[in-house]
């Protein structure tokens, strides 16, 4: 279930901090703009718990371009994105119901709304985007505090 999957992400984060702490290092995040600020596709206090997030202002397409420019192994570049929290092979895109390319389009469409008519799939992707964005907004916003 989702609670168990999120626990795996939190244990992974704890392990990464233990390794970083033992080596005078930091934990570097891998989230991109769509995940971190669009649909909130990360575990609160799990893979979202990092010291620095160098890719967070980059769309997934930009991350792929960067990987290509850096000469990252093709096998890694072509691997289906997955959070690794499930033992059934499901990908990020299986879980979200849209591809990163589609969700990137949705973010850009919202930022720079065009007057072009939408296809049925584009309308569906916008609905997926807003559903995920709204459901996960608690992850993307600062922790609420009570003013005295």
Role assignments for model-derived ranges:
Residues 1-10, 14-17, 21-26, 30-34, ...:
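ATP/NTP-dependent adenylation/nucleotidyl-transfer catalytic domains that generate, transfer
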């Amino acid at each position: 279930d989702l609670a168990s999957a999120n626990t795996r992400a939190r244990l992974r984060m704890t392990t990464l901090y233990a390794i970083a702490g033992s080596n005078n290092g930091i934990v570097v995040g891998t989230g991109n703009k769509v995940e971190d600020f669009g649909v909130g596709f990360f575990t609160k206090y799990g893979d979202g718990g990092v010291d620095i997030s160098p890719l967070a202002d980059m769309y997934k397409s930009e991350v792929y371009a960067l990987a290509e420019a850096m000469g990252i192994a093709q096998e890694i570049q072509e691997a289906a994105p997955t959070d690794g929290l499930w033992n059934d092979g499901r990908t990020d895109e299986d879980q979200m119901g849209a591809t990163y390319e589609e969700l990137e389009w949705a973010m850009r469409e919202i930022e720079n709304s065009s007057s072009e008519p939408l296809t049925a799939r584009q309308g569906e992707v916008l609905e997926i985007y807003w559903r995920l964005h709204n459901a996960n907004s608690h992850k993307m916003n600062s922790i609420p505090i009570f003013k005295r």
